[in-house]
Amino acid sequence: MSTTLSIPATGEAKNSKLQEFFVEQLQDIYWAEQKLVKTLPKMAEAAHSEELRQAFEGHLQETENHVSRLEKVFSSIGESAKTKKCLAMAGIVNEGEDIIDETEDNTAQRDVGLIFAGQKAEHYEIATYGGLIQLAKTLGYEEAAREMTATLEEEKKADSKLTSIAASANTEASREPKNN
């Protein structure tokens, strides 16, 4: 296991373009998490399998906690919690809504599509939190890094759970007849 050294930031670093970028990326993921709080109930309702429905409902509770954690992060770095529209998450959410619109109710095929959309969201969040944690450490924001590390671990677990559910959903969907 490799370790990453964290070099505390100087006063200059905290007033740098890197600091500005860090705050913009926090605003981006803050918007994304808030969007998911609104979207996950729709995904849960559209899910065919009870296991997938429960996974989305459980992750909704975690996502609400992620929003709260981000508010703590903003506070810990002396910034007010503001959002900046996350175009990546907006696109992923739109794709998920299209899947719901374009698939039949109560089918495993819909679940497969919802899992794809869910995992795309998770992977975006995993990448974003991974980068933000390193920036926080570089800038000397250890409390922010700890808060986001807890969120990152939950995102990884949610992704793993979706991967597990996909195995049975994919098999079930492969048995559904093709509609003409």
Range-by-range predicted roles:
Residues M1-N180:
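Amphipathic alpha-helical hairpins
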